[in-house]
Amino acid sequence: MFGFLKNLLDDNARDIRRLQKTVDRINSMEPEWQRLSDADLQHKTVEFRQRLENGESLDDLLPEAFATVREASRRVLGMRHFDVQLIGGMVLHQGRIAEMRTGEGKTLVATLPSYLNALTGRGVHVVTVNDYLAKRDAEWMGRIHRFLGLQVGLIIHGLDFAERREAYAADITYGTNNEFGFDYLRDNMVIQPQHMVQRELHYAIVDEVDSILIDEARTPLIISGQANKPTEKYYAVARIIPRLTKDVDYKVDEKAHSVVLTEEGVSRVEKMLGIDNLADSLDWAHHVNQGLKAHALMRRDRDYVVKDGEVIIVDEFTGRLMFGRRYSEGLHQAIEAKEGLEIQNESQTLATITLQNYFRMYDKLSGMTGTAKTEEPEFMQIYKMDVVQIPTNKPMQRKDLPDVVYRTEEGKFNAVVEEIVQSFRRGQPVLVGTVSIEKSEQLSDKLKRRGVPHQVLNAKHHEKEAEIVKNAGQRGMVTIATNMAGRGTDIILGEGVAELGGLYVIGTERHEARRIDNQLRGRSGRQGDPGQTRFYVSLEDDLMRLFGAENIQGVMDRLGMDDSMPIESGMITRAIENAQRRVEARNFDIRKHVLQYDDVMNQQREVIYDQRKKVLNGENLRDTVFDFIDTLVENMVNRFAGEEKYVENWDLPAMLAYAEETFQIAVTAEDLHEMEKEEVIAFFQEKAQERYSQREQELGLETIRELERIILLRVVDSHWMDHLDAMDHLRHGIGLRAYGQKDPLVEYKYEAYSMFQEMIASVQEEFLRYMFRVNVVVAQAEEEKQEAEAEAEAETVLKNAVENRSDDSLPKQPVKAEPRVGRNDPCPCGSGKKYKKCCGVKG
């Protein structure tokens, strides 16, 4: 074990030594660069781009480019990159993760690789966790880039189409993970290529990379519209779930946050709902699954609150109320049914992608954070990125004290309050990290009773949050915050605080991941400042209750310790960290397993979006249309012929009617007399292709090519939306296959493939029906109308997608955007048809 750790440390040290040689080269250039005039320094950008065109690589330019950014930063911001920041910049350029402690200037580090990679002209995305940080960095660090002649863009909440397009056209674009992901989805819903805003996904630098690529990796970004689905099944399930018995009819795994029916439970549910086979009814299976989750896993006032007749989600990490946000996949409706509230309309998913799959599409991906090494295996396996620990600029002075363990939560919080009171009397600032809004308010009440003035950080805007966190290092300040609050904002010590021991960080509970605890510790001891940290733990905490409190409980019992007596030892701290390692490994396994399911959907999305992009960009579809005709004819003949060899035994009337309706060709039974199946197929293919060639002459080549493009995009989008819903139901019902001794993942892959093939066949059939039947007058009118509608719809989707989300990044629950017109709503064109059967499909 120690040999393995030694190798890891040696590898990191070797990396640093190797990069230090380049740092020495950059340092040797500094005197020469300092003598350059502003104009000469700015001209370096033009020179570098010319050298790239002449065949030099970015690696060739790196030392000079980094020297240029360092000197520009010194002149513009008065900030000179430290040597360790140059090393961090090189690590990011290599597509790796730079682990840099809090206060070491990660924001300034990002200017180095972003400038270098922007020289290619292909764009660089700098990704932050919220709008406040994106705006701050674009304005602050953007001054360096603008001085050097680069354009800087900003993607935040509330921008219109033109502003977004301009921001993405810039050399370097700052923005949040959610905004980048939503823009990608919206780009894959447009009808005209000029409505797209993003360029290719070239290079991304992800700030707080652990938060975005691990904590929120599976957060689905969803653009949705209302589906108006019936709600009776939610109420029916809500009535029967309370009649089921835990551990008999269903089993809850708190560690895995999952609930499953037992075989007995399946039988009881089938009987109570009056259905024969739950596994065969994906819709009922989906409702039961979500109902079980709502009743057994989702707790009122922890996971959500009920306010004014609505279910409001509580963010697990920050404790904020997520107004306007809803759980997806029917879970929100199931909770509404459980609470006896009016069920709001379920949403129809129009487009979706997880952050994990979005960021894996970049040609080069890098990230920075204060805490990543503990998750390196996951970064390597999922994103192919290793972690390099960057040395601090000044030696660390922070003292991390051993954990203190109490028998009860009440005993623990009393001890925390006592410790805060003592520190407050000394004038030493204290930052207390809690795991939930409930716990922070509980602690706040105790401090009020002791007369200790303090600030509580929850459900505040980022601007206010950053201000509170920034002031948390002032003398006598007591700040209570959720563990994740205030990331990206440095806590600077006030006058005289260093002499008092610096900022004292108290953790009131160990998180499942060591990384989250390390983030809290990292608020103290920035840039060589003094500081201290300690965690207070009770045997009633979730981590201790679920993972290994028995041994410590035994020790406390033998010693006859009461609630107010703690155990404090390095051995206890190590035991807790071992429990965390086990949880981390289990969580990684769960995420890997879930990713196997996600990858199936992701592969299908890539196929659809890739084909869609080719159509959007004006690829000639004539050959594609003729391939569709050949395939559909073959399917038609096989369907109506069945196993019969002779034409006389086929269902000829139905086949001929189908051919006339679909291909607009009149064929009689006599035309097929004495033909074999292959001859019939060839005959119909030739007839249909001839008819389509006539359509080309009737409509004109230019008109029919544009019609093909618009109609195919509409039909694909319509069927893709329905496919997303079907896949979602399949995903939630597939677990029941395990009762039949079948591997759910294998079954899911098989059925997903079959469903995808069926969707493709349906797309081809519906597309051809439109193309054979549309006439020239309607085509011209519809085309003009469609362009106007497409543009209006793009604006509506964009506006609503942004308006229905809050600014910050959200773990666990999906992030949604909802356009106004639902697919089952009446079409706004006034036809009287449903939108999905009218302008939601055709062009």
Curated annotation (Swiss-Prot):
Family according to the record: Belongs to the SecA family.
Catalytic activity from the UniProt record: ATP + H2O + cellular proteinSide 1 = ADP + phosphate + cellular proteinSide 2
Reported cofactor(s): Zn(2+)
UniProt membrane topology term: Peripheral membrane protein
Annotated source species: Heliobacterium modesticaldum (strain ATCC 51547 / Ice1)
Subunit structure: Monomer and homodimer. Part of the essential Sec protein translocation apparatus which comprises SecA, SecYEG and auxiliary proteins SecDF. Other proteins may also be involved.
Cofactor notes: May bind 1 zinc ion per subunit.
CDD domains xrefs: DEXDc_SecA (cd17928), SF2_C_secA (cd18803)
Protein name: Protein translocase subunit SecA
Sites where the protein binds Zn(2+): C827, C829, C838, C839
GO MF annotation: an example: protein-exporting ATPase activity
Claim: Oxidoreductase is one of the keywords in the record: no
Chain intervals with Basic and acidic residues compositional bias: 802-823
